[in-house]
Regions:
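Metalloprotease/metallohydrolase-associated module, dominated by Zn2+-dependent proteases
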Residues: 2-37, 43-59, 97-131
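Catalytic Zn2+-binding segment of zinc metalloproteases
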Residues: 84-99
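Short pre-active-site segment immediately N-terminal to the catalytic Zn-binding motif
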Residues: 55-80, 91
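Short amphipathic alpha-helical segments and their helix-coil junctions
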Residues: 1-2, 82
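Generic alpha-helical propensity signal that fires on short helical segments
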Residues: 79, 86-88, 103-108
Length: 131
């Protein structure tokens, strides 16, 4: 799980990472803890970061470029490999990834499937994190 990330990978995704850093710094200001793991900033909530828990309430964590926001570090430990697949997806698709993710959800819905569970990016993340 220790990928070699290039400067290009960081730059290609940097606009989304900057957006994620906004939430990371806000969470940190309210007591969240930050950890650098495998070239990605992981941020986990604290009792005073209830808004972060609300942001990740439906799903335990969210990836924004090279930033992963989660409810707690224990949760991040459980979902780390899944979220790191999303980081690699960002590195593949760059700033287009959020749009492609939404389009994949819409396509799943149009096919009569679930917007999250049948999203091709989530299917890939579940499969690769289980390997």
């Amino acid at each position: 799980m220790k990928p070699q990330r290039t400067l290009f990978a960081y730059l290609w995704v940097s606009p989304v990472t900057v957006f994620g850093m906004f939430f990371a710094l806000l969470a940190y200001a309210f007591g969240a803890k930050m950890k650098w793991r495998y070239g990605v900033l992981e941020v986990a909530g604290h009792t005073r970061t209830h808004w972060l828990n609300k942001l990740t309430t439906r799903y335990e964590a969210i990836t924004l470029g090279h930033v992963i926001l989660g409810r707690k570090h224990g949760v991040l430990k459980t979902y780390r490999s899944h979220e790191h697949v999303h980081v690699r997806q960002y590195e593949r698709w760059g700033v287009l990834f959020p749009l492609l993710y939404v389009l994949a959800s819409l396509l799943a819905l149009l096919r009569g499937k679930h917007f999250y569970w049948d999203n091709v990016f989530e299917v890939e993340a579940r499969k690769k994190s289980a390997d």
